[in-house]
C-alpha cells in the first residue's frame, strides 16, 4: 500500500485478544460477528469512494479479520510498513474503544508525524474525553457524514 493519502483501519475490540483471556459482554451474542467485532463500518466504503472520486488514494485495512484468520499475523509489524499521509480508525460502538485506541497508539509510535483520525458514534459523543486523555488521536470527525470534512 505505498503512498496512499488515507488508510482507514478497523481494529479488533481488544488489540491483544489472542493473548489475553477476555470476558466478552452479551452484545457480542446479538451482533452478527465474533466477539472481536471484525466487521468494519459501511461508512468506510462510502468515504473511500468519495475520496477516490475527488482524486485521493484511500484504502481500508481490516486488522481484526487479518488477526482472526492468521494467528501469526503481526499487526504492529504490518502497521509499521504502511505508507500513508493520514490514518483513520472507527469508534462507533464502545466495545471497539480499547482496540481502536491501542492500535492508534501503535500507529502513532511508528508514524509520529501522520495525523490520526477517529470517527463514529462513540467517538463523536466522547470527543472531549478522547482528545484530552488519548494523545495518539489528533482529530475526531463528529457526526454521521464525514465525506466532506475529509477533504478539508
Give residue spans per PLM region:
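A generic secondary-structure micro-motif detector
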Residues: 36-37, 93
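Nucleotide donor/acceptor-binding cores
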Residues: 2-4, 85
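Short glycine-rich His-centered loop
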Residues: 4-36
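Short, conserved glycine- and acidic-residue-centered signature motifs
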Residues: 40
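Glycine-rich beta-alpha loop elements in corrinoid/cobalamin-binding modules
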Residues: 43, 47-50, 54, 59-152
Amino acid at each position: 500500500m505505498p503512498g496512499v493519502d488515507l488508510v482507514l483501519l478497523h481494529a479488533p475490540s481488544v488489540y491483544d485478544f489472542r493473548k489475553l483471556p477476555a470476558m466478552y459482554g452479551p452484545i457480542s451474542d446479538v451482533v452478527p460477528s465474533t466477539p472481536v467485532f471484525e466487521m468494519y463500518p459501511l461508512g468506510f466504503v462510502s468515504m473511500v469512494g468519495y475520496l477516490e472520486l475527488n482524486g485521493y488514494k484511500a484504502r481500508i485495512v481490516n486488522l481484526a479479520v487479518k488477526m482472526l484468520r492468521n494467528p501469526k499475523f503481526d499487526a504492529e509489524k504490518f502497521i509499521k510498513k504502511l505508507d500513508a499521509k493520514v490514518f483513520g480508525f472507527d469508534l462507533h460502538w464502545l466495545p471497539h474503544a480499547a482496540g481502536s485506541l491501542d492500535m492508534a497508539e501503535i500507529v502513532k509510535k511508528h508514524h509520529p508525524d501522520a495525523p490520526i483520525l477517529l470517527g463514529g458514534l462513540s467517538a463523536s459523543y466522547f470527543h472531549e474525553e478522547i482528545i484530552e486523555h488519548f494523545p495518539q488521536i489528533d482529530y475526531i470527525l463528529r457526526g454521521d457524514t464525514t465525506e466532506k470534512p475529509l477533504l478539508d
